[in-house]
Regions:
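ATP-dependent phospho-/nucleotidyl transfer catalytic cores
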Residues: 1-71, 80-100, 104, 122, ...
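Detector for the conserved DFG-like motif's central hydrophobic residue
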Residues: 76-77
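C-terminal end-of-chain micro-motif
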Residues: 85, 244-245
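ATP/Mg2+ or Mg2+-diphosphate-binding catalytic cores
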Residues: 111-131, 135, 145-226, 230-233, ...
Length: 245
């Protein structure tokens, strides 16, 4: 996992200066294109931070590693046939290509969570820091999980194309858990709304003091309550954000 993570990270780091801005509209359309064809009974869209940028697609696969003069070399691959047939030509973020590698090492090599962690840390060490910031990897802002969903949709399409029933069943089992993750994200959005409730409370306290409808003490108390609600909601929101790995 160390070599695979580092190799992908080094390749992507070279491509980073060629990156294009956040293209979340087309990335979400890409998900819709797959959903429309596959009919998976799931629907997921996500925002993405400005740090999430598209890069030229270069993938590596654990089954396509060569040894040249005693050193390992990765054979670069294109996107899958299913993606070429069903999706657009937009660039994907570096995290999307990492998740694609994660999916293949789990499928082909049986990697366990601790090995995935090593893979991720070695990749993270080589790519721009902004790509792996807390917000860039936040599940409520897309992060790694939306690209796992994308990868499983692609796996579903590939399994249908090649008649791979075992792989199809595995992808369907994964997709059944999507609704539970989305329900959790829905709860987080409720907590996030508490931030605006708190801000509104502070604004009301200010104008109530200005209009003298509340005493200074009561206005200050209301403003403090609003700030507690706002700060507390924001802390809970980020604390409960599902970890990327």
């Amino acid at each position: 996992p160390e070599w695979l993570g580092q190799t992908l990270g080094e390749i992507q780091n070279v491509l980073a200066p060629l990156s294009s801005p956040n293209d979340q509209k087309r990335w979400n359309q890409r998900l819709k294109d797959l959903e429309d064809v596959l009919k998976p009974n799931t629907l997921w869209r996500a925002p993405h931070t400005s740090a999430t940028k598209g890069i030229p697609s270069v993938r590596i696969h654990p089954n396509y590693i060569l040894e040249v003069e005693g050193e390992h070399r990765a054979l670069p691959l294109n996107q899958t046939i299913s993606e070429a047939l069903l999706c657009g030509t937009e660039r994907l973020p570096g995290i999307a290509e990492f998740i694609q590698l994660e999916g293949r090492v789990v499928e082909e090599k049986g990697y366990k969570p601790e090995q995935i962690e090593v893979l991720f840390e070695n990749w993270k060490r080589c790519v721009p820091a902004s790509w792996t910031s807390r917000k860039a990897l936040s599940t409520v802002l897309g992060g790694a999980w939306i690209w796992r969903y994308y990868d499983v949709l692609v796996v579903t399409a590939e399994s249908v194309l090649y008649g791979d029933e075992a792989r199809y069943d595995s992808s369907q089992k994964w997709l059944k858990d999507v609704s539970r993750l989305q329900a959790h994200l829905g709860v987080l959005r409720v907590w996030k709304s508490g931030v605006w409730v708190g801000i509104t409370t502070m604004v009301v306290a200010y104008y109530a003091w200005q209009l003298e409808t509340l005493s200074t003490i009561n206005s200050v108390g209301l403003a403090v309550l609003g700030s507690i609600i706002s700060i507390g909601s924001n802390l809970l929101y980020w604390k409960k954000d599902p970890p990327a790995f």
